[in-house]
Amino acid sequence: MLKIAIPKGRLLEEVSELFLSKSLIPSKIEESRKLIVDIDYFRFLIVKPSDVATYVEQGAADIGVVGLDVLKEEPKEIYEILDLKNIGKCSMVVAGKPEKLGDYKILHFTKVATKYVNIARSFFEGKDVSINIIKLNGSVEIAPIIGLSDYIVDITQTGKTLKENGLIVMEKIFDSHAKIICNKVAFRIKKYDIFKILDKLSDI
C-alpha cells in the first residue's frame, strides 16, 4: 500500500479530482472527520498543509502533495519529484493599503505580518530592508487595517480577499503551485509504484 499525504482544504479537492481523472482512484476523496482514507492500493493521510512535508520526511507517508510556498518556508530532506503546475496555483505577494504604495518604493524599515516568516525575511533582506516580523497564523489581512503592520506577506489565488479588505498587491515574490514530494527511502523501495503514478500525472 502506498501512503500519500495530502493537505486539507482546497488542494484536497483538486488532488482528488486529478487522481480521479487519471483513473488512479475509482471515487473522490471526500473531506470529512476521517483523516485516513483507504482507496484501492492507496492510503491517503489528510493533514494540515504545513505538515505534509514532515509526514513525508519522517516516513509516515511515502509521497505527498504540497505547495511550493510550504517547501520554501520550511525546506525538508525529501525529493521533489514532479511539478503539478496547474494544481494549487497561487502567488506569494507583499500586500498593503493603497496609500502605502509610495512608501513601499522607498522602504528602509517596516513592520510585516505573515505566517511565512522565513520567506518574508529572505525577501526583504534581499532588498536590504530591515523588517520587524509579526507572526500570525491566519487572517493576516486584518493587520494593516488596524495598524498592527505596514504590510503583509501571504499567498493569494484571485486577489478577492485582499480587495475585500481594502488591500492591494505591492509586489509579487513568486508564483506557487503544487509539487509531488517523496521520502528518500520510499523512493528506493517503492520506486515502481511511485513511477506508475508519475507516468499518469507527468502531463499535468
Curated annotation (Swiss-Prot):
Example GO molecular function: ATP phosphoribosyltransferase activity
Transmembrane segments annotated in the record for this chain: none
Predominant place of localization: cytoplasm
InterPro entries cross-referenced by the UniProt entry: ATP_PRibTrfase_cat, ATP_PRibTrfase_CS, ATP_PRibTrfase_HisG, ATP_PRibTrfase_HisG_short
Assigned keywords, A-Z: Amino-acid biosynthesis, ATP-binding, Cytoplasm, Glycosyltransferase, Histidine biosynthesis, Nucleotide-binding, Transferase
Keyword Amino-acid biosynthesis: yes
GO biological process, one term: L-histidine biosynthetic process
Free-text function comment from the UniProt entry: Catalyzes the condensation of ATP and 5-phosphoribose 1-diphosphate to form N'-(5'-phosphoribosyl)-ATP (PR-ATP). Has a crucial role in the pathway because the rate of histidine biosynthesis seems to be controlled primarily by regulation of HisG enzymatic activity.
NCBIfam families: hisG
Family to which the UniProt record says this protein belongs: Belongs to the ATP phosphoribosyltransferase family. Short subfamily.
Oligomer status and interactors: Heteromultimer composed of HisG and HisZ subunits.
Identification of the protein by name: ATP phosphoribosyltransferase
